[in-house]
A protein has these predicted regions:
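Acidic/histidine-rich alpha-helical segments that form the ligand environment
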Residues: 15-18, 22, 29, 77-132
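Transmembrane helix-bundle signature of multi-pass membrane transporters/permeases
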Residues: 47-49, 120-121
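Amphipathic alpha-helical coiled-coil segments
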Residues: 54-61, 126-132
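Conserved small/polar residues in nucleotide/adenosyl-binding loops
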Residues: 133-139
Length: 143
């Protein structure tokens, strides 16, 4: 039975997203603990974040084989494919996701958050440009 299109594929995508978010949260918590001088707690959060990264990578390895990038659906695996998937993701973020979020925030009167989303859209465009630059380097001439 194919993984693509299955409930298991969706479960892997959901688990990847959850583990990835946990990693980022725990690193944020570790930074907060550092500011508070709670070095032992910061260490616990960093260690846990590292474990969550391993879990997320495991999910991604299963998705890589048949399903591709869980965010874009683009094939992933080798560096050229990974750059193309990154460009697709970053392009979506700066052309659709963040502009739409900024509009909603502004419509709801959250101007500071709208400004934040607009700033992030610019950053994502820069990320896409950097990835595209590396994709078109002569060392990737087989693209």
């Amino acid at each position: 039975m194919s993984l693509k299109g299955s409930k298991t594929e969706q479960n892997l995508k959901d688990a990847f997203a959850g583990e990835s978010q946990a990693n980022r949260r725990y690193l944020y918590f570790a930074a907060k603990a550092d500011v508070e001088g709670q070095n032992d707690i910061a260490t616990v959060f960093r260690s846990t974040a590292e474990g969550e990264t391993g879990h997320a990578h495991g999910h991604l390895e299963y998705l890589e084989k048949e399903c591709g990038d869980p965010a874009t659906g683009e094939p992933i695996g080798d560096s050229v494919s990974n750059l193309k998937a990154a460009i697709a993701g970053e392009t979506h973020e700066y052309t659709d996701m963040y502009p739409g979020m900024a509009k909603t925030a502004r419509d709801e009167g959250h101007d500071e958050i709208a400004d934040w989303f607009e700033t992030l859209a610019k950053a994502e465009r820069s990320h896409a440009t950097v990835s595209y630059t590396h994709l078109t380097l002569p060392t990737n001439s087989g693209v």
